[in-house]
Regions:
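A residue-level detector for the "anchor" residue at the start of short, highly conserved motifs
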Residues: 2-190
Length: 190
């Protein structure tokens, strides 16, 4: 279970299914059982597990909800239209909450599960999503005070042991003119 995440599950599963609710991000390793299917529910997706390892990213403040299949198989049902998508390993289903559209892409699952190792991987991510992930990891408030970065897309990898200051410094080196300051425990990016 990643930082800032909540997993809700019953004290005992029903006789028909094993169902949990996730807000945030988690990796699941599930043993297949035809008689007792495992379901992960988010605000946007219901994921039915067919025996597998997969990552779900469903932070409520994020624009996208995603499911990345590491091994095995899952089917994901979009709650907005009922469409069900059967996924194969190394696929990521991304659902855009603003447009209501979903996409499937081929990915390296180890990047999406990097957080389990203490690493952070971002591939073509919006600066606001990257800053929010740093905020969750370090439990601090962050503010991007300039609108000129709203459409900024970056690719970066940070390894376990790098400090928040090292991460922010690296981002500022990637973006000409970007600076950050820490005031009263809050990070301001301008």
């Amino acid at each position: 279970l990643n930082a800032g995440s909540v997993l809700i599950y019953p004290e005992a599963f029903s006789a028909k299914e094993r169902s949990v609710y996730l807000s945030g991000e988690a990796v699941f390793e599930v043993t297949h059982n035809d008689e007792l299917p495992f379901m992960v529910n988010t605000s946007d997706l219901t994921i039915r597990v067919h025996g597998t390892t997969f990552n779900v990213n469903a932070y409520p403040e994020s624009r996208n909800t995603s499911a990345t299949l590491c091994e095995g198989s899952i089917s994901a049902t979009l709650k907005n239209n009922g469409e069900s998508i059967l996924m194969i390993p190394e696929e990521r289903l991304s659902y855009d909450r603003e447009t209501g559209k979903s996409t499937i892409s081929r990915v390296n699952p180890s990047e999406d599960t990097a957080w389990k190792r203490g690493d952070m991987c971002f591939r073509s991510e919006n600066i606001h999503a990257i800053v929010k992930a740093i905020e969750r990891k370090y439990g601090i408030n962050t503010y991007v005070t300039s609108g000129k970065y709203d459409d900024m897309i970056l690719t970066a990898k940070f390894v376990q042991g790098e400090t928040m200051e090292q991460m922010l410094g690296a981002i500022c080196k990637l973006v000409p003119g970007m600076k950050y300051s820490i005031v009263n425990g809050c990070v301001y990016i301008r």
